[in-house]
Amino acid sequence: MSKKEMILSWKNPMYRTESSYHPAGNILKELQEEEQHSIAGGTITLSTCAILSKPLGNNGYLCTVTKECMPSCN
């Protein structure tokens, strides 16, 4: 990718979506299908959330561990 094309992709979101260039390459080619199915980054499991949120006073179905869903925050 030339410098001109790179700058154009920074400034133009439509061109960016059409461009297949990415500095890291195509990471999905490097991962096996089994590895792709096991990716769960940036989250906690449901059981961990339920175990931690109930003692904090959150009796809802699913909530974050932080207290934004608790009645005391409303």
Swiss-Prot record:
* Gene Ontology MF annotations: signaling receptor binding
Its GO CC terms?
extracellular space
According to the UniProt entry, the cross-link of type Lanthionine (Ser-Cys) is at: S53-C63
Pfam families named among the record's database cross-references: Lantibiotic_a
Q: Which InterPro entries match?
A: Lantibiotic_alpha
Q: GO annotations under biological process?
A: defense response to Gram-positive bacterium; killing of cells of another organism
Residues joined by cross-link Beta-methyllanthionine (Thr-Cys): T45-C49, T64-C69, T66-C73
Using the record's annotations, give every residue carrying the modification 2-oxobutanoic acid. Answer: T43
* The record's account of how the chain is modified after translation: Maturation of lantibiotics involves the enzymatic conversion of Thr, and Ser into dehydrated AA and the formation of thioether bonds with cysteine. This is followed by membrane translocation and cleavage of the modified precursor.
(Z)-2,3-didehydrobutyrine sites (modified residues): T48
Keyword tags: Antibiotic, Antimicrobial, Bacteriocin, Lantibiotic, Secreted, Thioether bond
Task: State where the protein is found.
Answer: Secreted
Task: Name the species this protein comes from.
Answer: Bacillus licheniformis
* Function statement: Lanthionine-containing peptide antibiotic (lantibiotic) active on Gram-positive bacteria. The bactericidal activity of lantibiotics is based on depolarization of energized bacterial cytoplasmic membranes, initiated by the formation of aqueous transmembrane pores. When present individually, LchA1 exhibits activity towards B.subtilis L1 (IC(50)=9 uM), Rhodococcus sp. SS2 (IC(50)=9 uM), M.luteus B1314 (IC(50)=1.2 uM), B.megaterium VKM41 (IC(50)=1.8 uM), S.aureus 209p (IC(50)=3.1 uM), B.pumilus 2001, B.globigii I, B.amyloliquefaciens I, M.smegmatis 1171 and M.phlei 1291.
Propeptide feature: residues: 1-42
List the protein's name. Lantibiotic lichenicidin VK21 A1
2,3-didehydroalanine (Ser): residues carrying this PTM: S47
